[in-house]
Design a protein with these regions (language model features):
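Amphipathic alpha-helical segment used for protein-protein interaction
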Residues: 26, 116-151, 155-165, 207-209
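Structural recognition of an alpha-helix C-terminal capping motif at a helix-to-coil junction
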Residues: 57-64, 78-90, 175
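Short, charged helix-capping/linker segments at alpha-helix termini
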Residues: 4-7, 25-33, 44-61
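DNA-recognition helix of helix-turn-helix
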Residues: 89, 93, 145, 154, ...
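Arg/Lys-rich amphipathic alpha helix in sigma70-family domain 2
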Residues: 49, 71-75, 85-107, 127
Length: 210
């Protein structure tokens, strides 16, 4: 899967996404394909962090619902990302209920060896959370922390939008994301001042929407 965008990068496409969604609602199939290409990488990363290897199947189910209900959507590009994330989350939770399993951590020893080293910057350490092995580590977090990190870092939602997806207050989502990132920093082997640096960057990155 490679790297998926950080929130700042994802949001750069919100204008194009909003325009594509509007055209798609008027029946433009090419515009729907553009919206899919913009949203799918982050959505798939979000689902990988919840259901692991079944993410592709769950994403397919989610996109069927998205296409079916597209005419009901009202909002801009950022709103569309939040709306699609809500649908994908519902499908993921349905999938987990059918499996009756709890997501498990799946990182390997080699994965840990390849994580950010002590000489990496705090920003690089945060960036590393978007790689596929990191999504496996995120799956091992408590559910509230995992979903908060995934929605903020992988999908690129702001605080209020992530809170709407989860049905929680923005402050609660921000706290869960901060705690999740701090726990991941420990798993990455980043301790002491470096760990605090990562979580400080996380606080700025994952703070309330500007």
């Amino acid at each position: 899967m490679g790297q998926v965008g950080q929130p700042r990068r994802v949001q750069e496409y919100d204008g194009e996404l909003g325009a594509a969604v509007a055209r798609a609602q008027d029946g433009d199939e090419n515009a729907f394909a553009i919206a899919y290409r913009i949203v799918q990488p982050g959505l798939l990363g979000f689902l990988r962090g919840i259901v692991g290897d079944d993410a592709e199947d769950v994403a397919s189910d989610a996109w069927l619902e998205i296409a079916r209900d597209l005419g009901r959507f009202r909002g801009d590009g950022a709103g569309f990302r939040g709306w699609t994330a809500t649908i994908a989350r519902h499908r993921a939770l349905d999938h987990l209920r059918r499996r009756r399993v709890r997501p498990q951590a799946g990182g390997t020893d080699q994965d840990v060896l390849d994580l950010a080293g002590p000489h990496n910057t705090h920003e690089q350490a945060l960036e590393s959370l978007s790689t596929e092995w990191a999504l496996e580590l995120i799956r091992g977090l408590p559910r509230d922390q995992a979903e908060a990190v995934l929605l903020r870092v992988v999908v690129g939602l702001d605080g209020p939008a992530a809170a709407r997806v989860l049905g929680k207050r923005p402050g609660a989502v921000r706290t869960a994301a901060h705690r999740g990132l701090k726990r991941l920093a420990r798993q990455l082997g980043i301790g002491g001042e470096a760990e605090e640096g990562v979580t400080d960057v996380a606080s700025r990155t994952l703070g309330e929407s500007k």
